[in-house]
Amino acid sequence: MPTITSYFGFLLASLIFTLALFIGSSKIRLL
């Protein structure tokens, strides 16, 4: 069970990091 939870947490963190990076790149492009 802990393995699945840690994997889900890692996946969620990766998704958030990618989304934040995409938004940052978009803002830089607008500027």
Swiss-Prot record:
One of its GO terms (molecular function) is electron transporter, transferring electrons within cytochrome b6/f complex of photosystem II activity. One of its GO terms (biological process) is photosynthesis. Its main location: plastid. This is Cytochrome b6-f complex subunit 6. Coiled coil: none annotated. One of its GO terms (cellular component) is cytochrome b6f complex. PANTHER family: CYTOCHROME B6-F COMPLEX SUBUNIT 6. The chain crosses the membrane at residues 4-24. Pfam families: PetL (PF05115). Belongs to the PetL family.
